[in-house]
Structure formats: C-alpha cells, structure tokens
C-alpha cells in the first residue's frame, strides 16, 4: 500500500486524487523541480487478474504519440516489482461531469468555447490515427483556467486496428455515449463514433441532461438507435443544427470533423489551439510489462477487451453492475446479452423452461414460469419471469427475474440459459 510521503524515483507521492477498479491516481511532486504531476498507480497483480495488460499497454502507446494542449500528457512510465506508475500531467479543475452536476448547464458562449477545444483535441487524435472510443463527460478534465483536457485512452484504437473492411469491430464505450453502429455489434468507423460521443457531450453541456437516458438499458439503446433527442427551446438554431448533425444515427451521413469546423456556429469566436508537435523522448522502461508469456500472447479478441457491457475499466464513474451481467447469481434480477434473433431466443427460452419442468404463461416477449417441487423435508419450487428486449436485430437483452423460490434451482436455470443462449464471451467471463 502506498503511503503519503513515499517516493517513486524522483517523485514524492501525496493525496489520492481518484480511484477506480484497477488503479488509483495520486498527486505527486517532482522533488528536483517542484513541478506537480498526477501518478496513475496500477497493481501488476490486478492487471494479471483482470487480463487488461493489452489495454494498459494500448493507453501508454497512445499517449506517447499525443502532444496537444487539450489532451492530458504522459511524461514517463516507471515500474517496480509490483506496480506500474504512469506520470501524467496534473489537471486540477476536476472533470466536466462534476462541473455540470454542481453548477448546471453552461451558457451557449461558454459551452461553445469548451466544445471548440474538445473538437480540437479529437481532431488532433484522428489526424494521428487515434480514436478515443470512450469520450464522455468524466473523461474531459478542466485545468485551473477552465481549459479542457481529454483523458483515459484505455479503450482507444490506432488506425492499424482496422480490419480489411476498414472498420473497427470491438464494442467500446459507455452506454449513454455510444453510437448506434457500435451498439449494433457490427463494424464501425472510429472517427464517426467519436463524433457521436462529442455530440452527446455538447448536448449535456448546453442542456444539463443526457440526450438518451432511462433506468432501463434496453430503452436507452432503443432511443440511441432512433436518434432525434428532444432539444429545449432555449437552444439556438445553430447549436440545434450542430447537435442534430452529430447525433445522426446513420454514420455515413453524420457530420465529419471538417463539417463541424466549417459550421458557422462552431466558427464563432473560434481560435484554434496552438501546439508544438515535435517528438519527445519518453522514458518507458522495457520491463514495465514483464509478465508470464501467456499473458502477453492473449488475443485482442478475447474478453480482455472492455466493452459497453463488460466494463472493468480504469474509471469508477460508471458502474454497470446494476444493469448487467456482473450481478450476483443470488440476486433476484439478472440480465445478459444474446446475438440470437429475438423470435428464436424466446422459443429457445421456452424450450429450456419446458425441459426443466416449468409450467408456462406466455405474453408477447415475456414468459412467466412456475415449478413446484416437494421433498421429504420441505415444499420448494421456483417462480420466475423471463423477458426479451430487442436492441437491434443482432443484439438482444434477456432479463430474468425471480419472484420467489429455490435459489439453487434459480442458479441452475440461469447458468443453463447463459450457457446455451448468451454471447460466448460473456459465458467465459461470467462462469469463470
């Protein structure tokens, strides 16, 4: 455990600035220069346990090539036997999420200024062949002067990760900010999906609320596929047009970065960011990722990739456990995804219920199943409801709810449904 006053190389560690599932960030001082930094401390054992070495390496490699005033800088990476230390630019103004929650929406003038900086940073990334894939308010920090700094590139992709069809194929991001083509689990253009996320951020900046939101994840996804969020009357026509063009559900007709920069609303009082893009020498130790060979050889297509439904990411701001498959089997309500067609999925669920001896009541995409059992010692059984929510033709959510009954039987039922009908990557992750 790191204690206050401990040193890592020339850095003296101080208070904790933030903490996530697999890392914590501490304030640090360079004892030679007095300069302030933020050091992200990652336990190697945690990397091994969660199989996220690929993502952390990707974050480091991505930050190495980015040098822009609106992007958090990586200064160096150090390692001990048990930890990795990423020495980052210290940004003291908190994140945009906290700013909106505490003070509400921004004026259109303030919001446009921040949005211009966001687009400058994202445009720079895209020109470098880097696509963030997890842009959200929590990943936009504010410095002491109110300038934005984009952070958390753990889900980012470089242009060489595109397949032969020229598209990315890994579902990444946070549900409220994810583009419809990403949720559809098909190939997508990284630049277009980032633009969608920027559109969501612009909407929140100017309205103080999310464009696509609901307590039910399936409903959120339906709203995203439909697009066309309600825009308050106080939003100017120029801003309204910009939002609608960025939140176009069709990635082909969605506005590009060039189109955004050419828009009159964006150009108003716009001053492009100045930056020096000369190459720097980064101190990246060769032994930072010395792990067992099988860890290094893990395929990027394995469940180590974090997506919108398997979020084990570096941030604690978003926890999907209340929505999705990380819920404990003992809990009354469990959800998982399936790539089967909704009609086939419902028929297969009905078959499994029947084979396990349940009596069924069926209504639309909802099944109520009851099983009564008696033993010498007690009367037992199980009453459950299963419902299918269609998010897209190739992606459905199954929700299983226990009304009452035997927890062990409920677990058997859930595990069979998941094994036979769930997405294969989820089966490996959940039943490990």
From Swiss-Prot:
Residues 331-360 are annotated as: PPI. The active site is at residue 134. InterPro entries: Kinase-like_dom_sf, NAF/FISL_domain, NAF_dom, Prot_kinase_dom, Protein_kinase_ATP_BS, Ser/Thr_kinase_AS. Keywords: ATP-binding, Kinase, Manganese, Nucleotide-binding, Phosphoprotein, Serine/threonine-protein kinase, Transferase. GO terms for biological process: signal transduction. The modification Phosphoserine is found at residue 156. Residues 11-266 form the Protein kinase domain. Residues 301-325 form the NAF domain. The modification Phosphothreonine is found at residue 170. It catalyses: L-seryl-[protein] + ATP = O-phospho-L-seryl-[protein] + ADP + H(+); L-threonyl-[protein] + ATP = O-phospho-L-threonyl-[protein] + ADP + H(+). Its EC number is 2.7.11.1. It is an enzyme of class 2 (transferase). Gene3D superfamilies: Kinase associated domain 1, KA1, Phosphorylase Kinase, domain 1, Transferase(Phosphotransferase) domain 1. Belongs to the protein kinase superfamily. CAMK Ser/Thr protein kinase family. SNF1 subfamily. The activation loop within the kinase domain is the target of phosphorylation/activation by upstream protein kinases. The PPI motif mediates the interaction with the ABI (abscisic acid-insensitive) phosphatases. This is CBL-interacting serine/threonine-protein kinase 17. The lineage of its organism: Eukaryota, Viridiplantae, Streptophyta, Embryophyta, Tracheophyta.
């Amino acid at each position: 455990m790191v204690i206050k006053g401990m040193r890592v190389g020339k850095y003296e560690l101080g208070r904790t600035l933030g903490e996530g599932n697999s890392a914590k960030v501490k304030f640090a001082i360079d004892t030679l220069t007095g300069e302030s930094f933020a050091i992200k401390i990652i336990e190697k054992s945690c990397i091994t346990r969660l199989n996220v070495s690929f993502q952390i390496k990707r974050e480091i490699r991505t930050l190495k090539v980015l040098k822009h005033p609106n992007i958090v800088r990586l200064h160096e990476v150090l390692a001990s036997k048990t930890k990795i230390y990423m020495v980052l630019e210290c940004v003291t103004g908190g994140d945009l999420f906290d700013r909106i929650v505490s003070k509400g929406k921004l004026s259109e003038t303030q919001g446009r200024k921040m949005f211009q900086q966001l687009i400058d940073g994202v445009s720079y990334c895209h020109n470098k062949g880097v696509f963030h894939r997890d842009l959200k308010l929590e990943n936009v920090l504010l410095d002491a002067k109110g300038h934005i700094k984009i952070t958390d590139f753990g889900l980012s992709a470089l242009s060489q990760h595109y397949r032969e069809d020229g598209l990315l194929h890994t579902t990444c991001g946070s549900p409220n900010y994810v583009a419809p083509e990403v949720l559809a689990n098909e190939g997508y253009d990284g630049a277009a999906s980032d633009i969608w996320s920027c559109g969501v951020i612009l909407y929140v900046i100017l309205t103080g609320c999310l464009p696509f939101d609901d307590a039910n994840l399936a409903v959120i996804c339906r709203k995203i596929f439909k697009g066309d969020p309600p825009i308050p009357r106080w939003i100017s026509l120029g801003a309204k047009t910009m939002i609608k063009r960025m939140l176009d559900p069709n990635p082909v007709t969605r506005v590009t970065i060039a189109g955004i920069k050419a828009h009159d609303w964006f150009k108003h009082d716009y001053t492009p960011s100045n930056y020096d893009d000369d190459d720097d020498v980064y101190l990246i130790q060769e032994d930072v990722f010395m792990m067992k060979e099988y860890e290094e050889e893990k395929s990027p297509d394995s469940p180590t990739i974090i997506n919108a439904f398997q979020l084990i990411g570096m941030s604690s701001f978003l926890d999907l456990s209340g929505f999705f498959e990380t819920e404990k089997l003992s809990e009354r309500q469990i959800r998982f995804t399936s790539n089967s067609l909704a009609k086939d999925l419902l028929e297969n669920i009905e078959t499994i219920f029947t084979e396990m001896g349940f009596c069924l009541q069926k209504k639309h995409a909802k099944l109520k199943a009851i099983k009564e059992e008696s033993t010498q010692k007690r009367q037992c059984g199980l009453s459950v409801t299963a419902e299918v929510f269609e998010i897209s033709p190739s992606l459905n959510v199954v929700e299983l709810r226990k009304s009452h009954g035997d927890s062990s039987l409920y677990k058997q039922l859930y595990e069979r449904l998941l094994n036979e009908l769930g997405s294969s990557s989820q089966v490996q992750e959940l039943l490990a």
